[in-house]
């Protein structure tokens, strides 16, 4: 059973490329839903612009999400046969912890894969919320090399329709990108990556961390020699605006000139981890698909689903030096903490290993209301303090991290 779509070795090659949409704008695809794109290429040599006048803009895809019925288009199927099937499967998911991957796929509970993708050219990318060099937003998405390990997660290879040996192994590369601008959730690779939501269902019964957490592996972003500039307001990062629930491995951001925002600004990630769960006694956003206030204690079974691990990842500034700035102030009488970090702006229960920042010139935040750090602006156990094990809460930044 191969329920997802497959795009294999497809390409766009132009001297000039402009993509303009109200929402879901992508250099290759506006939206990927339960879709695998393997070794696909977008190349524009002279001019390259992707713009969304609203949300979701990406150099490769506007959004990479679950199946249409379970996520993007779940509201479109309530009154037809497909909607009835999805509703039935969702009920089964909520009551059966031993559900099969095929049944999950039938409901669209299957992530999208961007494997071995290449985006090249003088890209200028813009939108409002969720703007990223590869994708504006990824719900449980995989952005990784087209190695056999990842191909075998896709049904066409898992079910032996295709042989992994017939596919060239390629890393994910974004080169030549000049500027990425937006309002909230803006990043060089993704505006936001998070654990997927499934038709409003909190899937602690599914083994959520292993099945629906995002994965980024072997990705390189290279700006021009003049440098890549990334600009926004909230959750702005050289690699990711925010990242909640997943793993980031072997990621490099090169020729980064500046990352600037109002708050939560980082050379690699603006905000990493579950966010401000403990600060308000609960989480009011739709994390993990919940549409109501989520108390910290309710995360007990899915604590690992909101934790972020980062390994062997690097931020390299331009020769003149990288600047990271959080420009917000409390001039209006507010009590907001403004944070900026050379690697992560705000780190909540995030494990970072063998990662560094080079050619860092300046990190700044407001003198009175801000926190700025060469590697991390603020680091704390955050929302996982009451749900993770004692072992998890021991100091999650290792001695192999550095700023040069």
What is the meaning of each model-derived region?
Residues 1-404:
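Surface-exposed loop/turn motifs in large extracellular/passenger domains
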